[in-house]
Amino acid sequence: MVGVRLVFTNAFVVTVLLTLLLDVVVKPAEGQSSCSLSSRPHPRGICGSNLAGFRAFICSNQNSPSMVKRDAETGWLLPETMVKRNAETDLDDPLRNIKLSSESALTYLTKRQRTTNLVCECCFNYCTPDVVRKYCY
């Protein structure tokens, strides 16, 4: 009877340890959210104009400037900043004759750092006002 009890106890301990280990491995760190291209909005997440309004409300209570939405019509490329290419002047470009192998060219590319943003933290995950306050500036 003691032998059976000991086996059951060991199996129980192993099961508990594996469960705890898997629970620790799967959970993201406290206060950090992760998003990917396949992420979907959280059932209690705040998205779109609701998120912008929530952020403006939280930040206005901290005497911080509210977020200004970028005008889609003007965008970032203003007509006066665009330059039409000229075939004659492009021939004088000192970088024109630089040739690199694919391997060499790829060494100049760096992997983007994975960062979380307000949409990731509050739309695709559940967030609190304290999380939103981190995005007040």
UniProtKB/Swiss-Prot annotation:
Compartment list: Cytoplasmic vesicle, Secretory vesicle
SUPFAM superfamilies: Insulin-like (SSF56994)
GO terms assigned for molecular function: hormone activity
Pro-piece positions: 71-83, 86-110
Full protein name: Molluscan insulin-related peptide 2
UniProt source species: Lymnaea stagnalis (Great pond snail)
Tree of life domain: Eukaryota
Residues of the signal peptide: 1-31
